[in-house]
Amino acid sequence: MKNQDQALIFEVSKEGRIGYSLPKLDVEEVKLEDVFESDYIRVEDAELPEVSELDIMRHYTALSNRNHGVDSGFYPLGSCTMKYNPKINESVARFAGFANIHPLQDEETVQGAMELMYDLQEHLIEITGMDTVTLQPAAGAHGEWTGLMLIRAYHEANGDFNRTKVIVPDSAHGTNPASATVAGFETITVKSNEHGLVDLEDLKRVVNEETAALMLTNPNTLGLFEENILEMAEIVHNAGGKLYYDGANLNAVLSQARPGDMGFDVVHLNLHKTFTGPHGGGGPGSGPVGVKADLIPYLPKPILEKTENGYHFNYDRPEAIGRVKPFYGNFGINVRAYTYIRSMGPDGLRAVTEYAVLNANYMMRRLAPFYDLPFDRHCKHEFVLSGRRQKKLGVRTLDIAKRLLDFGYHPPTIYFPLNVEECIMIEPTETESKETLDGFIDKMIQIAKEVEENPEVVQEAPHTTVIKRLDETMAARKPVLRYAKPAPVQV
């Protein structure tokens, strides 16, 4: 029943069917022609579906049952930290004093909300080892861009206009070079060594007087801790550059290590990942940016300050890069992150990292006999396998991911990072039980055996979903973006 094909809402439509009722008009009727110019008025009615309320409920309930989320099943998407979002976060975010306020209210009327944001900033400062934090950026890549614009403003304020290049590792998130480009920089790639870490000799080769910054994730996207980070920071700083921390993998070091202590000058965080704001489906997110003291003058305005008279926004910042978002960040996600931090406490956050790392290493060791392990060493919160041996038997990593759908699992991240052939990146997070991990591992082992004994089963997967495999080429080149009403049948 769950996977039964579902008609489009347009196909359910019957002319004249009504799904609502409105009270009799009790004000003077106004004609559209009296309000809008003729150019803005439809000549023909829009072809909208005509359905009953029951039709609507059944249609969208059926579609929702096809969705997969953290609340419905294991979601081991590497580098995405798809952890469970505690429902206490939702309860607090729905407090009337948070849910019913408006960003244009006078500061005096929202002191409680401002206190929460200020306290959240203080917690993030302590967690990251930065000197201050802005909550304004809306999401991770937005935080990246904001941080890079701060670095650019810093160099330009010091008359250093030739620093036009940002260095990123070959294992970097795709958003890193993209954010650098949008911020006006040229990206330079630094290679990884045979251990999956940044090659120090190659870093020394590419760093020069044109280097604005080095962007790093630590641990990196392979799930490996950059153990030479202090030396890397020294190399970049001695050349006059800044060190940027992509906080995508902060879940691996909470309350155990701080970017600020590693030598990073700028850090962005993903509150919707590490600190359990719900994410996926396009947002919302929250990407606060923390900086060291020499970058504070350039933070986007306003900044939230505390005085003896309460909390207020300071707009008097002549060197600021300007606003990066209307108002002051995605407040609802910030409430959820604050609730999470306060409910967990320092010991709880430390346990988050301990269990995230334990889960990842447990899975890696159980799966290593059945898939190639490019870097056979202790990992942090996530790890990378390779489907090279399966590819030799005619089965691609994509096929393995499709086969997992038959067992009700969301596939891991595949083909990323780009420097691992047939890459399978798995991040279990700390919130999953051993029983859940074992269930997924058993299916991965089953798939590996199917590749050897009956590869067609994997090559033709999925078998149990409504949609099997999309024609991705046609979807990209000739997408169907609107419903076309069938022509009347000629009798």
Swiss-Prot record:
Q: What is this protein called?
A: Probable glycine dehydrogenase (decarboxylating) subunit 2
Residue positions, PTM N6-(pyridoxal phosphate)lysine? 273
Write the record's keywords in alphabetical order, separated by commas.
Answer: Oxidoreductase, Pyridoxal phosphate
User: InterPro entries from the entry?
Assistant: GcvPB, GDC-P_C, GDC-P_N, GDC_P, PyrdxlP-dep_Trfase, PyrdxlP-dep_Trfase_major, PyrdxlP-dep_Trfase_small
Q: EC number(s) for this protein?
A: 1.4.4.2
Presence of keyword DNA-binding: no
Q: Please state the gene responsible for encoding this protein.
A: gcvPB
For molecular function, the Gene Ontology terms on record are:
glycine binding; glycine dehydrogenase (decarboxylating) activity; pyridoxal phosphate binding
Gene3D superfamilies associated with the record: 6.20.440.10, Aspartate Aminotransferase, domain 1, Type I PLP-dependent aspartate aminotransferase-like (Major domain)
